[in-house]
Swiss-Prot record:
Keywords: ANK repeat, Metal-binding, Repeat, Transferase, Ubl conjugation pathway, Zinc, Zinc-finger. The keyword Transport does not apply. It catalyses: S-ubiquitinyl-[E2 ubiquitin-conjugating enzyme]-L-cysteine + [acceptor protein]-L-lysine = [E2 ubiquitin-conjugating enzyme]-L-cysteine + N(6)-ubiquitinyl-[acceptor protein]-L-lysine. A zinc finger (RING-type) spans 296-345. This is Probable E3 ubiquitin-protein ligase XBOS36. SUPFAM superfamilies: Ankyrin repeat (SSF48403), RING/U-box (SSF57850). Pathway: Protein modification; protein ubiquitination. ANK repeats lie at residues 44-73, 77-106, 111-140, 149-178, 193-222. It comes from Oryza sativa subsp. japonica (Rice). Residues 355-397 are annotated as: Disordered.
Amino acid sequence: MGNSLGCVGLGERLAAAAKDGDAAEAQRLLAANPGLARCTTFGNLNSPLHVAAAKGHHEIAALLLENGADVNARNIYGQTPLMQACRFGHWEVVQTLLVFRCNVWRVENLSGRTALHMAAAGGHVKCVRLLVADAAGDRDGYVNKAANGGVTALHLAALHGHVECVHLLIDERASLAAQTLPCAAPPMASIGAGSTPLHYAACGGEVKCCQILVSRGADRTAINCNGWLPIDAARIWGCNWLEHVLSPKSHLPIPKFPPSGYLSQPLPSLIAIAREQGLNLSSEVSDGFDEGADACAVCLERPCTVAAEGCDHELCVKCAMDLCSVIKSYDSAGIAGEIPCPLCRTGIASFRTTAAPPPPSLAGSPARRSRRNNSGGGGGEHEASNSGGSEKGYGSIDPDAGAVVPLYYAPPFAPSAILT
Protein backbone atom coordinates (compact mmCIF):
# COMPACT_ATOMS: atom_id res chain seq x y z
CA MET A 1 0.00 0.00 0.00
CA GLY A 2 2.85 2.36 0.82
CA ASN A 3 4.34 1.74 -2.57
CA SER A 4 1.00 2.58 -4.19
CA LEU A 5 0.66 5.78 -2.15
CA GLY A 6 4.08 6.93 -3.31
CA CYS A 7 3.06 6.55 -6.93
CA VAL A 8 0.20 9.02 -6.92
CA GLY A 9 0.91 11.67 -9.54
CA LEU A 10 4.20 10.66 -11.16
CA GLY A 11 3.35 6.97 -11.02
CA GLU A 12 0.02 7.55 -12.72
CA ARG A 13 1.77 9.59 -15.39
CA LEU A 14 4.20 6.73 -15.98
CA ALA A 15 1.30 4.27 -16.27
CA ALA A 16 -0.37 6.61 -18.77
CA ALA A 17 2.86 6.84 -20.79
CA ALA A 18 3.10 3.03 -20.78
CA LYS A 19 -0.50 2.80 -21.98
CA ASP A 20 -0.06 5.37 -24.76
CA GLY A 21 3.36 4.13 -25.90
CA ASP A 22 5.02 7.45 -25.07
CA ALA A 23 8.61 6.26 -24.69
CA ALA A 24 10.05 9.78 -24.35
CA GLU A 25 7.78 10.63 -21.41
CA ALA A 26 8.45 7.27 -19.77
CA GLN A 27 12.20 7.75 -20.12
CA ARG A 28 12.03 11.27 -18.68
CA LEU A 29 10.03 10.12 -15.64
CA LEU A 30 12.29 7.13 -14.99
CA ALA A 31 15.43 9.25 -15.33
CA ALA A 32 14.10 11.50 -12.57
CA ASN A 33 12.96 8.61 -10.35
CA PRO A 34 13.79 5.01 -11.38
CA GLY A 35 11.75 3.73 -8.42
CA LEU A 36 8.56 4.61 -10.31
CA ALA A 37 9.07 1.44 -12.36
CA ARG A 38 8.00 -0.63 -9.34
CA CYS A 39 4.86 1.34 -8.50
CA THR A 40 1.36 -0.10 -8.74
CA THR A 41 -2.01 1.51 -9.32
CA PHE A 42 -4.88 1.53 -6.85
CA GLY A 43 -7.59 -1.08 -7.13
CA ASN A 44 -6.26 -3.69 -9.55
CA LEU A 45 -2.57 -3.28 -8.56
CA ASN A 46 -1.39 -3.19 -12.16
CA SER A 47 2.18 -1.96 -12.52
CA PRO A 48 3.30 0.16 -15.50
CA LEU A 49 4.86 -3.05 -16.83
CA HIS A 50 1.43 -4.74 -16.80
CA VAL A 51 0.04 -1.84 -18.81
CA ALA A 52 2.90 -1.81 -21.34
CA ALA A 53 2.62 -5.59 -21.76
CA ALA A 54 -1.14 -5.48 -22.34
CA LYS A 55 -0.74 -2.70 -24.90
CA GLY A 56 2.17 -4.35 -26.73
CA HIS A 57 4.77 -1.62 -26.13
CA HIS A 58 7.88 -3.82 -25.93
CA GLU A 59 10.39 -0.95 -25.93
CA ILE A 60 8.70 0.65 -22.92
CA ALA A 61 8.57 -2.76 -21.24
CA ALA A 62 12.34 -3.09 -21.72
CA LEU A 63 12.87 0.44 -20.37
CA LEU A 64 10.85 -0.36 -17.24
CA LEU A 65 12.71 -3.61 -16.67
CA GLU A 66 16.08 -1.89 -17.06
CA ASN A 67 14.98 0.52 -14.31
CA GLY A 68 14.10 -2.21 -11.84
CA ALA A 69 10.50 -3.20 -12.61
CA ASP A 70 9.56 -6.60 -11.22
CA VAL A 71 9.26 -8.92 -14.23
CA ASN A 72 7.02 -11.28 -12.21
CA ALA A 73 4.84 -8.63 -10.54
CA ARG A 74 1.26 -9.72 -9.84
CA ASN A 75 -1.91 -7.67 -9.96
CA ILE A 76 -4.95 -8.28 -7.77
CA TYR A 77 -5.92 -11.29 -9.89
CA GLY A 78 -2.46 -12.84 -9.69
CA GLN A 79 -1.73 -12.03 -13.32
CA THR A 80 1.84 -11.27 -14.35
CA PRO A 81 2.92 -9.01 -17.23
CA LEU A 82 3.67 -12.19 -19.20
CA MET A 83 0.05 -13.29 -18.85
CA GLN A 84 -1.16 -9.90 -20.08
CA ALA A 85 1.13 -10.04 -23.11
CA CYS A 86 0.02 -13.59 -23.97
CA ARG A 87 -3.64 -12.76 -23.46
CA PHE A 88 -3.45 -10.11 -26.17
CA GLY A 89 -0.90 -11.88 -28.38
CA HIS A 90 1.99 -9.41 -28.07
CA TRP A 91 4.85 -11.75 -28.94
CA GLU A 92 7.52 -9.00 -28.95
CA VAL A 93 6.67 -8.20 -25.33
CA VAL A 94 6.88 -11.93 -24.57
CA GLN A 95 10.37 -11.92 -26.10
CA THR A 96 11.43 -9.03 -23.89
CA LEU A 97 10.01 -10.58 -20.72
CA LEU A 98 11.70 -13.92 -21.43
CA VAL A 99 15.05 -12.20 -21.93
CA PHE A 100 14.60 -10.60 -18.49
CA ARG A 101 13.98 -14.09 -17.03
CA CYS A 102 10.28 -14.01 -16.28
CA ASN A 103 8.78 -17.12 -14.70
CA VAL A 104 6.61 -18.89 -17.28
CA TRP A 105 5.24 -21.29 -14.63
CA ARG A 106 3.32 -18.64 -12.62
CA VAL A 107 -0.45 -19.23 -12.45
CA GLU A 108 -3.43 -16.89 -12.16
CA ASN A 109 -5.13 -16.88 -8.75
CA LEU A 110 -8.69 -17.79 -9.71
CA SER A 111 -8.30 -20.09 -12.71
CA GLY A 112 -4.86 -21.60 -12.12
CA ARG A 113 -3.98 -20.84 -15.74
CA THR A 114 -0.47 -20.13 -16.92
CA ALA A 115 0.52 -17.72 -19.68
CA LEU A 116 0.51 -20.75 -22.01
CA HIS A 117 -3.18 -21.37 -21.30
CA MET A 118 -3.96 -17.73 -22.15
CA ALA A 119 -1.93 -17.77 -25.36
CA ALA A 120 -3.54 -21.05 -26.47
CA ALA A 121 -7.07 -19.85 -25.64
CA GLY A 122 -6.49 -16.72 -27.74
CA GLY A 123 -4.86 -18.56 -30.65
CA HIS A 124 -1.59 -16.65 -30.30
CA VAL A 125 0.72 -19.28 -31.76
CA LYS A 126 3.84 -17.07 -31.75
CA CYS A 127 3.47 -16.60 -28.00
CA VAL A 128 2.97 -20.35 -27.56
CA ARG A 129 6.13 -20.93 -29.60
CA LEU A 130 8.20 -18.64 -27.37
CA LEU A 131 6.83 -19.97 -24.09
CA VAL A 132 7.48 -23.60 -24.99
CA ALA A 133 11.01 -22.76 -26.13
CA ASP A 134 11.76 -21.15 -22.76
CA ALA A 135 10.48 -24.22 -20.90
CA ALA A 136 12.75 -26.57 -22.84
CA GLY A 137 14.17 -27.99 -19.59
CA ASP A 138 10.79 -29.52 -18.67
CA ARG A 139 8.80 -29.09 -21.85
CA ASP A 140 6.47 -32.04 -21.24
CA GLY A 141 5.56 -30.83 -17.76
CA TYR A 142 4.94 -27.27 -18.91
CA VAL A 143 2.89 -28.11 -22.00
CA ASN A 144 0.71 -30.52 -20.00
CA LYS A 145 0.34 -28.38 -16.88
CA ALA A 146 -3.34 -28.38 -15.92
CA ALA A 147 -5.29 -25.37 -14.69
CA ASN A 148 -8.25 -25.63 -12.31
CA GLY A 149 -10.57 -28.36 -13.53
CA GLY A 150 -7.73 -30.27 -15.17
CA VAL A 151 -7.88 -28.12 -18.31
CA THR A 152 -4.67 -28.05 -20.34
CA ALA A 153 -3.57 -25.58 -22.99
CA LEU A 154 -4.48 -28.16 -25.65
CA HIS A 155 -8.05 -28.37 -24.30
CA LEU A 156 -8.45 -24.59 -24.64
CA ALA A 157 -6.90 -24.35 -28.11
CA ALA A 158 -9.14 -27.20 -29.31
CA LEU A 159 -12.30 -25.70 -27.79
CA HIS A 160 -11.71 -22.34 -29.47
CA GLY A 161 -10.76 -23.89 -32.82
CA HIS A 162 -7.21 -22.56 -33.02
CA VAL A 163 -5.73 -25.01 -35.51
CA GLU A 164 -2.13 -23.77 -35.48
CA CYS A 165 -1.96 -23.82 -31.67
CA VAL A 166 -3.42 -27.34 -31.56
CA HIS A 167 -0.92 -28.50 -34.17
CA LEU A 168 2.07 -26.98 -32.38
CA LEU A 169 1.06 -28.20 -28.91
CA ILE A 170 0.61 -31.76 -30.17
CA ASP A 171 4.05 -31.67 -31.79
CA GLU A 172 5.42 -30.38 -28.48
CA ARG A 173 4.11 -33.58 -26.85
CA ALA A 174 0.86 -32.30 -25.35
CA SER A 175 -1.14 -35.24 -24.02
CA LEU A 176 -4.05 -36.36 -26.20
CA ALA A 177 -5.50 -38.34 -23.29
CA ALA A 178 -5.53 -35.58 -20.63
CA GLN A 179 -8.90 -35.56 -18.85
CA THR A 180 -10.71 -32.71 -17.15
CA LEU A 181 -11.97 -32.76 -13.56
CA PRO A 182 -15.45 -32.07 -12.13
CA CYS A 183 -14.56 -28.54 -10.97
CA ALA A 184 -14.09 -27.03 -14.43
CA ALA A 185 -15.63 -23.58 -14.79
CA PRO A 186 -18.49 -22.75 -17.20
CA PRO A 187 -18.87 -23.23 -20.13
CA MET A 188 -16.41 -26.11 -19.85
CA ALA A 189 -18.31 -27.69 -16.96
CA SER A 190 -21.20 -28.48 -19.31
CA ILE A 191 -18.90 -30.58 -21.49
CA GLY A 192 -18.38 -32.88 -18.54
CA ALA A 193 -15.53 -34.16 -16.42
CA GLY A 194 -13.26 -36.78 -17.90
CA SER A 195 -13.27 -35.02 -21.28
CA THR A 196 -10.25 -35.25 -23.55
CA PRO A 197 -9.03 -32.55 -25.96
CA LEU A 198 -11.02 -34.35 -28.69
CA HIS A 199 -14.24 -33.80 -26.71
CA TYR A 200 -13.36 -30.11 -26.50
CA ALA A 201 -12.52 -29.95 -30.21
CA ALA A 202 -15.88 -31.60 -30.96
CA CYS A 203 -17.66 -28.84 -29.03
CA GLY A 204 -15.57 -26.19 -30.76
CA GLY A 205 -16.72 -27.36 -34.19
CA GLU A 206 -13.44 -26.87 -36.09
CA VAL A 207 -12.98 -29.76 -38.54
CA LYS A 208 -9.23 -29.39 -38.91
CA CYS A 209 -8.63 -29.43 -35.14
CA CYS A 210 -10.49 -32.74 -34.93
CA GLN A 211 -8.61 -34.12 -37.93
CA ILE A 212 -5.21 -33.26 -36.44
CA LEU A 213 -6.13 -34.83 -33.10
CA VAL A 214 -7.46 -38.03 -34.70
CA SER A 215 -4.52 -38.32 -37.10
CA ARG A 216 -2.10 -38.11 -34.16
CA GLY A 217 -3.90 -40.84 -32.21
CA ALA A 218 -6.73 -39.25 -30.21
CA ASP A 219 -9.25 -41.87 -29.12
CA ARG A 220 -12.66 -41.48 -30.80
CA THR A 221 -14.13 -44.03 -28.37
CA ALA A 222 -13.18 -42.16 -25.17
CA ILE A 223 -16.20 -41.66 -22.88
CA ASN A 224 -16.42 -38.79 -20.38
CA CYS A 225 -18.35 -38.72 -17.10
CA ASN A 226 -21.53 -37.68 -18.92
CA GLY A 227 -21.31 -40.88 -20.92
CA TRP A 228 -20.49 -38.96 -24.10
CA LEU A 229 -18.22 -39.96 -26.92
CA PRO A 230 -16.62 -37.05 -28.80
CA ILE A 231 -19.26 -37.50 -31.52
CA ASP A 232 -22.00 -37.20 -28.88
CA ALA A 233 -20.50 -33.93 -27.65
CA ALA A 234 -20.46 -32.64 -31.24
CA ARG A 235 -24.14 -33.50 -31.72
CA ILE A 236 -25.21 -31.92 -28.43
CA TRP A 237 -23.31 -28.74 -29.28
CA GLY A 238 -24.85 -28.64 -32.76
CA CYS A 239 -21.69 -29.53 -34.69
CA ASN A 240 -23.19 -32.30 -36.82
CA TRP A 241 -20.73 -31.69 -39.67
CA LEU A 242 -18.04 -33.42 -37.58
CA GLU A 243 -19.68 -36.86 -37.69
CA HIS A 244 -17.54 -38.13 -40.58
CA VAL A 245 -14.40 -37.26 -38.59
CA LEU A 246 -15.48 -38.34 -35.10
CA SER A 247 -17.54 -41.46 -35.75
CA PRO A 248 -15.66 -44.57 -34.55
CA LYS A 249 -17.23 -46.42 -37.49
CA SER A 250 -16.19 -43.88 -40.11
CA HIS A 251 -14.12 -45.28 -42.98
CA LEU A 252 -13.32 -41.92 -44.51
CA PRO A 253 -9.56 -41.32 -44.64
CA ILE A 254 -8.09 -38.77 -42.23
CA PRO A 255 -5.42 -36.57 -43.82
CA LYS A 256 -1.86 -36.83 -42.57
CA PHE A 257 -0.31 -33.68 -41.19
CA PRO A 258 3.39 -32.81 -41.39
CA PRO A 259 5.17 -31.35 -38.35
CA SER A 260 3.93 -27.92 -37.34
CA GLY A 261 5.54 -25.02 -39.15
CA TYR A 262 5.82 -23.24 -35.79
CA LEU A 263 8.30 -25.69 -34.30
CA SER A 264 11.50 -23.72 -33.74
CA GLN A 265 14.71 -25.50 -32.84
CA PRO A 266 16.94 -22.40 -32.62
CA LEU A 267 14.78 -20.47 -30.12
CA PRO A 268 16.15 -22.01 -26.87
CA SER A 269 19.73 -21.20 -27.88
CA LEU A 270 18.75 -17.66 -28.89
CA ILE A 271 16.92 -16.97 -25.64
CA ALA A 272 20.03 -18.03 -23.71
CA ILE A 273 22.25 -15.77 -25.84
CA ALA A 274 19.84 -12.83 -25.59
CA ARG A 275 19.90 -13.10 -21.79
CA GLU A 276 23.65 -12.57 -21.91
CA GLN A 277 23.71 -9.85 -24.56
CA GLY A 278 20.33 -8.10 -24.34
CA LEU A 279 18.13 -7.33 -27.35
CA ASN A 280 19.56 -3.86 -28.18
CA LEU A 281 16.13 -2.40 -28.90
CA SER A 282 17.34 1.18 -29.31
CA SER A 283 17.28 2.49 -32.87
CA GLU A 284 20.38 4.55 -32.11
CA VAL A 285 22.73 1.60 -31.68
CA SER A 286 23.92 1.93 -35.28
CA ASP A 287 26.09 4.87 -34.23
CA GLY A 288 27.49 3.16 -31.18
CA PHE A 289 29.18 -0.07 -32.24
CA ASP A 290 32.72 -0.73 -33.35
CA GLU A 291 33.93 0.44 -36.73
CA GLY A 292 35.28 -3.09 -37.20
CA ALA A 293 31.92 -4.76 -36.55
CA ASP A 294 29.61 -5.90 -39.33
CA ALA A 295 26.13 -4.42 -39.43
CA CYS A 296 23.28 -6.91 -39.41
CA ALA A 297 22.25 -7.60 -43.02
CA VAL A 298 18.56 -7.54 -42.07
CA CYS A 299 18.15 -4.31 -40.08
CA LEU A 300 21.43 -2.54 -40.98
CA GLU A 301 21.28 -0.89 -37.54
CA ARG A 302 22.76 -3.29 -34.99
CA PRO A 303 26.07 -5.17 -34.93
CA CYS A 304 26.14 -8.87 -35.77
CA THR A 305 26.38 -10.77 -32.49
CA VAL A 306 25.07 -14.26 -33.34
CA ALA A 307 25.93 -16.73 -36.08
CA ALA A 308 23.86 -19.58 -37.48
CA GLU A 309 25.32 -23.02 -36.94
CA GLY A 310 26.00 -24.56 -40.33
CA CYS A 311 26.00 -21.65 -42.78
CA ASP A 312 27.76 -19.25 -40.33
CA HIS A 313 25.79 -16.23 -41.53
CA GLU A 314 25.72 -13.52 -38.88
CA LEU A 315 22.80 -11.44 -37.60
CA CYS A 316 22.04 -9.23 -34.64
CA VAL A 317 20.36 -11.05 -31.78
CA LYS A 318 17.11 -9.05 -32.16
CA CYS A 319 16.65 -9.94 -35.84
CA ALA A 320 17.54 -13.56 -35.11
CA MET A 321 14.93 -13.66 -32.34
CA ASP A 322 12.30 -12.12 -34.62
CA LEU A 323 13.18 -14.57 -37.38
CA CYS A 324 12.74 -17.59 -35.12
CA SER A 325 9.59 -16.19 -33.50
CA VAL A 326 7.71 -15.38 -36.71
CA ILE A 327 9.01 -17.34 -39.70
CA LYS A 328 7.64 -20.83 -40.22
CA SER A 329 10.08 -23.72 -40.15
CA TYR A 330 10.38 -26.57 -42.61
CA ASP A 331 11.68 -30.12 -42.66
CA SER A 332 15.33 -30.24 -43.66
CA ALA A 333 16.90 -33.68 -43.98
CA GLY A 334 14.13 -35.10 -41.81
CA ILE A 335 14.68 -32.62 -38.96
CA ALA A 336 11.56 -30.64 -38.06
CA GLY A 337 11.79 -27.14 -36.67
CA GLU A 338 14.76 -25.77 -38.58
CA ILE A 339 14.36 -22.10 -39.52
CA PRO A 340 15.51 -21.05 -43.00
CA CYS A 341 18.42 -18.63 -43.01
CA PRO A 342 17.28 -15.28 -44.51
CA LEU A 343 20.49 -15.06 -46.53
CA CYS A 344 20.93 -18.56 -47.98
CA ARG A 345 17.85 -20.55 -46.88
CA THR A 346 19.96 -23.20 -45.17
CA GLY A 347 18.09 -24.77 -42.25
CA ILE A 348 19.22 -23.34 -38.88
CA ALA A 349 19.00 -25.64 -35.85
CA SER A 350 20.83 -23.38 -33.39
CA PHE A 351 22.77 -20.14 -33.02
CA ARG A 352 26.06 -19.32 -31.34
CA THR A 353 27.71 -16.07 -30.35
CA THR A 354 30.05 -14.56 -32.91
CA ALA A 355 33.77 -14.23 -32.43
CA ALA A 356 35.13 -10.82 -31.47
CA PRO A 357 35.30 -8.50 -34.52
CA PRO A 358 38.74 -7.78 -36.03
CA PRO A 359 40.45 -4.49 -35.14
CA PRO A 360 39.38 -1.40 -37.11
CA SER A 361 42.65 -1.43 -39.08
CA LEU A 362 41.48 -4.62 -40.80
CA ALA A 363 38.01 -3.31 -41.60
CA GLY A 364 38.88 -2.58 -45.24
CA SER A 365 41.00 -5.65 -45.90
CA PRO A 366 40.20 -7.89 -48.91
CA ALA A 367 39.40 -10.80 -46.60
CA ARG A 368 36.82 -8.72 -44.77
CA ARG A 369 35.26 -7.44 -47.99
CA SER A 370 35.08 -11.01 -49.24
CA ARG A 371 33.32 -12.14 -46.06
CA ARG A 372 30.76 -9.36 -46.41
CA ASN A 373 30.09 -10.27 -50.03
CA ASN A 374 29.67 -13.94 -49.19
CA SER A 375 27.28 -13.21 -46.35
CA GLY A 376 24.81 -11.66 -48.77
CA GLY A 377 24.52 -14.55 -51.26
CA GLY A 378 21.89 -17.14 -51.65
CA GLY A 379 18.51 -15.58 -52.38
CA GLY A 380 15.53 -15.98 -50.03
CA GLU A 381 11.80 -16.43 -50.34
CA HIS A 382 10.46 -15.39 -46.93
CA GLU A 383 8.98 -12.06 -45.99
CA ALA A 384 11.57 -11.32 -43.31
CA SER A 385 14.59 -12.21 -45.47
CA ASN A 386 17.08 -9.88 -47.12
CA SER A 387 19.18 -12.13 -49.32
CA GLY A 388 21.80 -11.27 -51.84
CA GLY A 389 19.84 -12.42 -54.90
CA SER A 390 18.90 -10.08 -57.70
CA GLU A 391 15.17 -10.66 -57.41
CA LYS A 392 13.28 -7.49 -56.56
CA GLY A 393 11.94 -7.39 -53.01
CA TYR A 394 14.70 -9.40 -51.35
CA GLY A 395 17.92 -7.46 -51.74
CA SER A 396 20.82 -6.73 -54.04
CA ILE A 397 24.57 -6.47 -53.89
CA ASP A 398 26.08 -3.03 -54.19
CA PRO A 399 29.20 -3.69 -56.34
CA ASP A 400 30.94 -0.55 -55.11
CA ALA A 401 30.37 -0.94 -51.39
CA GLY A 402 30.43 -4.74 -51.36
CA ALA A 403 27.55 -4.91 -48.90
CA VAL A 404 24.00 -6.13 -48.84
CA VAL A 405 21.52 -3.39 -49.71
CA PRO A 406 17.98 -4.49 -48.77
CA LEU A 407 15.26 -3.38 -51.14
CA TYR A 408 12.40 -4.36 -48.90
CA TYR A 409 12.04 -5.40 -45.31
CA ALA A 410 8.69 -5.47 -43.55
CA PRO A 411 9.02 -6.24 -39.84
CA PRO A 412 6.24 -8.44 -38.44
CA PHE A 413 3.27 -6.54 -37.08
CA ALA A 414 2.04 -7.17 -33.55
CA PRO A 415 -1.64 -6.29 -33.19
CA SER A 416 -2.48 -3.76 -30.55
CA ALA A 417 -5.15 -4.47 -27.97
CA ILE A 418 -7.18 -2.36 -25.60
CA LEU A 419 -6.62 -2.87 -21.90
CA THR A 420 -10.00 -3.17 -20.28
